[in-house]
Amino acid sequence: MNAREQIVRVLEEVFEQGGYSNIALNQALEHSQLSDKDRSFVTEVVYGTVARKITLEWYLAHVIEDRTKLDPWLYYLLMMSLYQLVYLDRIPDHAIVNEAVQIAKRRKEGSEKFVNAILRKLLREGLPAVDTIKRKNKRYSVEYSLPVWLVKALIEEYGEERACAIFKSLYQRNKSSIRVIDLDEKEELAQLLEATSSLLASSALVKEQGHFAAHSLFKEGRITIQDESSQLVAPALDLQGDEWVLDACAAPGGKTTHLASYLTTGKVTALDLYDHKLKLIQENANRLHVADKILTKKLDATKVFETFGPDAFDKILVDAPCSGIGLIRRKPDIKYNKESADFVSLQAIQLAILDSVCQSVRKGGIIVYS
């Protein structure tokens, strides 16, 4: 499977199966034989296509009468090809079209003619002008690929000028950050990875760009991908090594494994509602060699006190479910999975979780709410 075929597969998983873009991408690249150059290309196009989804759909709607008649993979092939045509200037247009045609031909004989016709029509006629959209919120929605409700909410909260600055900031390139498992190796790994020490977290290394999930150090469990701010959470619990710790909302396990790294005789109980998310925690724990410190349990975090009773844990982490809006730049698919009504329901869930877990912490214990 070549790089562009890999991109289509990842987009199918994200848009059709509801997968997380970062996890779907990491898993795909972990099992691929692509070169480092191709891995970087796949990463850029996957995140770019997901981030620009609304914009790309608007463009395609002008040349495709009914997308529901298309196989999903075919539509995502067109979407990722259009992303390259619009936003990447280092690849010749004819090469992008030719690659898309070849992929279509391999997957479904005859579909290559449709792909060729659509992409060449867009190149020949040019893209429709976004500034012709009369309704302001809709125009910003298409221009910045944001749901209309979010555009409206941000303008109401911050005013149009500042909101537009926020919209633009969502497309600034993220730095890649990792957590070094053995701090004695930090300097050595920084040189090896050509990364620099974080100014925020003592265990973090940062780099302008890079796909660490494909690196042998990641597979060996010597590094793991984790945001700098996320790495500040575990130290806040002031773990001494022998505590019984609860991670009430644990998936995918980044903070759970970080907590476990501080323990000697203690244990972390990691909760989640879904089996596939518990599996992610277990996979991370195995890779980072802390599986013996982690107990996973399928449980609604609002049922902690009902299940474990009083004084069950020395320390508790509540990484409560939230809108995730602040993570859009790093996890662009978040913005398509939320609605304004979610904010109200999330508040009730957050309070219910906190009300339950606070009854299960021992006297003198610590609860960190993040």
Can you describe what each PLM-predicted range is?
Residues 1-370:
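S-adenosylmethionine
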